[in-house]
């Protein structure tokens, strides 16, 4: 998973 994908799974785009 790329950084952007992880951000979305974490909660959303920071």
Curated annotation (Swiss-Prot):
GO terms for cellular component: extracellular region. The keyword Electron transport does not apply. Expressed by the venom gland. Its main location: secreted. One of its GO terms (molecular function) is toxin activity. It is found in: Secreted. Disulfide bonds: none annotated. Keywords: Neurotoxin, Secreted, Toxin. Belongs to the scolopendra toxin 4 family. This is Scolopendra 5885.28 Da toxin. The lineage of its organism: Eukaryota, Metazoa, Ecdysozoa, Arthropoda, Myriapoda.
